[in-house]
Amino acid sequence: DTWVDKTLPLGDLRKRVEGSGWLYFECDGHDYSSIKETLAHAKTESQRPVFIYAHTKKGSGVSFMERFDSNGKFYKFHSGSPSDQDYMSAVNELVKKLGFSHELNWSQSIAFKNGIDVESDDLTPKTRNQSLIQIWAGILEELFESDKSLIALDADLSYDTGTYKVADKFSAQYIQCGIAEQDMVSMAGTLALSGKIPFVHSFASFLTTRAAEQIFNNLSENSKVIYCGFLAGVLPSAPGHSHQAVSDFGIVSSFPNIEIFEPACETEMSLMKSLVYESDKSIYLRVGSVDLPEKVDPKMVQLGRITQRKFGEKYAIITSGPSMAKIALEVARAESENEIAVFTYPTPKRHFN
């Protein structure tokens, strides 16, 4: 999302590499001649391992993709897919540089044999109409405003996990850990034992697998940490299978001394404001990135209880999270009006325990 020196400064990279016994080379990663020449030099070394540092610029070759945002802090084209318009502008700029005179113009479309319609989704967490990430950013801001013992830790995903407001307004309570979930979780455990309440932020697929051992160690020491796992579940699928968290619930459920909280909407998410203080356990906040079902009356939402979303007299569907809540409501409304009831339960592990 941002500059390397703001996430995990490299220091004197040459000294670090050569100090480990490696041969160090640098080259221009956008210059094929420079790359070819460097590789030729590297091949002459037969005794030591070789480290090549290729200097590159993200979005190089496309004028508007080489720039950061207006405040120079975040890179726009890291989080979310480019819009069709931006994509075509980038393609045509590259085509022109290659010496072609004609412009390309097409729209993205995918056709399935079963007739399912698929639309491209270029919305980011900050531009989606209603997003749990936006809501979480506001909740964090509210909590941090009144409590200096709270610390936000971020794995270079401030836009995708909602820590951007805390980073701007409460920088003394914000730690940018870079893409290093194991270190981040261990750091959080130490902060918790010193009397702080740390909020750890990353994608669910990375947080619960890479740092599973560190999470378990923290729990075994009764240190209270709020683990915030985003992009949970199969949808949205655009980031690919590596970013889809389908085992996180099972992994965290096997741990002791931890609550699981999976809100389905803004109203349920607001319960985190009280759960952070009421629970004496660590909390795993499981957040999906799909559009949300409609809000419910705050009077219908209470910690440790199911939330009724639709009345029904014959059957009941009980689920958690926004994705399944939307599907359950669609299924229930496809039947007779009062036949199927729909409930969401944001604290499912309490039931299993």
Q: How would you label these PLM feature ranges?
A:
Residues E26, F100-R286, D291-L292, M300-L303, ...:
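Thiamine diphosphate
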